[in-house]
């Protein structure tokens, strides 16, 4: 494997990776110590809402997964869990003192980095690994309380288009919103839909702690949360371990460690002021923007990209031009793709144009067909069916084999299914169902498919997808749901309340009138048309 063109030996690998991670943020200045100390000196006694109770610490300790890998302090999670009643009182005092002073001890900030491959085999270290930080177990417990306080405040002003690591939001909801915009726009064949899939380069590693601190202050975060959160990040040290080889520890000026509870929260806050006038979604560091126009030279998306580049320059972030892609969706005959100018990023580098892109685990194609995604799922699970054969031949109880099937195969076939289920063709739906038939045939060789479903207690995959869609839509119908605004009421809420007895049989939402069959591939339109 190589790093920046140089071959790296296994013995040198941990130090090389650690030095590379340090070099990423070396140019970013460390935390302004005087400003942080002034903030700490302004802290008064912790408000009652920020005082952790001994019982809460006891519950957190007793819920630790005993199988968790020890952090760099080598403190056993099993020991902490089994002796939670003994550790609760002293740990509670330490956490409350840490919050009151806005100081996190260096032992809690030391992390062991495990490089997780993004692909196999790893060839380019700068692109093919994700550094996951393992922190002390006690630090994670303290983080869990601070993350709760952080979110209580942040949820009041979080960007409505941010779906990542947020209660009540998920990848499925993000994809439903995004796909709905695409399908609605494509119902008019004159519309040219340009989608920009943005990839940040080393996003978590480039977070400037000073800028993060000022953003917390600007958004009126309680000073105890601000001081503690920045203290957890400043002057932190890390080392890389691969097998039995360990690097030397090195300090970092910037960045949020991936694998911690506070990492995604800090990043979401950092990019919370990154907004667009165009339709867009954010899932932590995954950002997607779309422009809809009947003019092939409409500059809206280019302007959005220019604004993004300006934001990155101010916030010390970088766009990975090589991984940032554009997809054009157009069903008209008036223009050719060649009439649509390429997007230009930094230094006039063109953004590559693709016909298919994998967004949050789901493949979107320029023809708004799910063939690419279905093929991807079938190929992925085909390699796993062999495990069902092995378990069955080994004489493992059939109920246990069914559980394995549900865990490693069915879960893949149902990921974000409300997004793509409405647009499946009969052939695609049948090919997905055939995977379950094949697995049950292996587990129950003497039974037909209907009998195997009864014995195993499973439903047809098509039935499960329909139930999942109906259940999710029932949630969206609640007025407080994130996506409820996508539904247009037939009458005003006040009128509905006055006449609710008369209107029980009346469907409360407008049914979309589609010009083409494409609109009915949208989850929202599908559910409304079927009056779920």
Where are these regions (language model features)?
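Conserved polymerase palm-domain catalytic core
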Residues: 198-283, 292
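Catalytic palm active-site di-aspartate
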Residues: 71, 110-113, 130, 162-166, ...
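Surface-exposed loop/turn segments and immediately adjacent short secondary-structure elements
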Residues: 1-126, 133, 137-141, 158, ...
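Short, conserved micro-motifs composed of acidic
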Residues: 303, 318-355
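Basic, alpha-helical interaction scaffolds
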Residues: 274, 349-419
């Amino acid at each position: 494997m190589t790093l920046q063109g140089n071959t790296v030996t296994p013995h040198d690998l941990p130090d090389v990776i650690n030095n590379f991670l340090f070099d990423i943020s070396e140019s970013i200045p460390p935390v302004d110590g005087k400003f942080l100390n002034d903030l700490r000196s302004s802290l008064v006694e912790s408000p009652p809402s920020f005082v952790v109770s001994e019982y809460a610490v006891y519950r957190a300790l007793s819920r630790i997964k005993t199988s968790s890998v020890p952090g760099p302090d080598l403190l056993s999670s099993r020991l902490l869990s089994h002796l939670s009643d003994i550790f609760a009182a002293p740990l509670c005092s330490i956490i409350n003192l840490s919050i009151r002073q806005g100081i996190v001890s260096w032992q809690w900030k030391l992390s062991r980095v495990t490089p997780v491959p993004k692909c196999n085999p790893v060839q380019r270290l700068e692109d093919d690994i994700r550094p996951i930080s393992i922190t002390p177990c006690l630090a994670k417990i303290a983080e869990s309380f601070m993350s709760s306080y952080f979110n209580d405040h942040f949820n009041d002003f979080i960007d409505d288009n941010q779906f990542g690591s947020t209660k009540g939001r998920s990848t499925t909801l993000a994809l439903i919103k995004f796909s709905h915009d695409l399908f609605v726009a494509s119902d008019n064949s004159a519309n040219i839909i340009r989608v920009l899939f943005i990839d940040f380069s080393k996003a978590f590693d480039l977070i400037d702690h000073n800028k993060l601190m000022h953003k917390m202050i600007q958004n009126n975060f309680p000073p105890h949360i601000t001081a503690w959160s920045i203290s957890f990040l400043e002057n932190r040290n890390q080392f890389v371990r691969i097998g039995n080889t360990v690097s030397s520890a090195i300090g970092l000026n910037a960045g949020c460690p991936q694998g911690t509870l506070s990492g995604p929260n800090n990043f979401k806050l950092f990019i919370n002021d990154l907004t667009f006038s165009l339709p867009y979604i954010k899932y932590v560091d995954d950002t997607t923007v779309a422009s809809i126009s009947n003019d092939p030279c409409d500059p809206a998306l280019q302007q959005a990209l220019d604004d993004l580049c300006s934001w990155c320059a101010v916030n010390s972030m970088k766009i990975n031009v090589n991984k940032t892609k554009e997809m054009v969706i157009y069903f008209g005959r008036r223009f050719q793709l060649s009439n649509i100018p390429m997007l230009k990023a930094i230094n006039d580098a063109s953004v590559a144009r693709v016909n298919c892109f994998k967004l949050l685990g789901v493949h979107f194609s320029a023809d708004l067909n799910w063939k690419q995604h279905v093929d991807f799922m079938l190929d992925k699970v085909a390699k796993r069916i062999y495990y069902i054969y092995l378990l069955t031949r080994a004489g493992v109880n059939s109920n246990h084999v069914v559980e394995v099937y549900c865990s490693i195969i069915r879960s893949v076939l149902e990921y974000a299914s409300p997004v793509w289920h409405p647009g499946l063709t009969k052939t695609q739906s049948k090919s997905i169902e055939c995977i379950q038939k094949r697995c049950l045939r292996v587990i129950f060789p003497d039974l037909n498919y209907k009998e195997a479903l009864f014995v195993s207690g499973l439903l047809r995959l098509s039935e499960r997808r329909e139930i999942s869609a109906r259940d999710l839509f029932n949630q969206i119908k609640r007025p407080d749901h994130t996506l409820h605004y996508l539904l247009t009421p037939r009458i005003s809420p006040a009128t509905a309340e006055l006449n609710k007895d008369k209107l029980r049989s009346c469907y409360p939402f407008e049914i979309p009138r589609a010009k083409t069959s494409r609109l009915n591939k949208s989850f929202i339109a599908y559910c409304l048309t079927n009056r779920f």
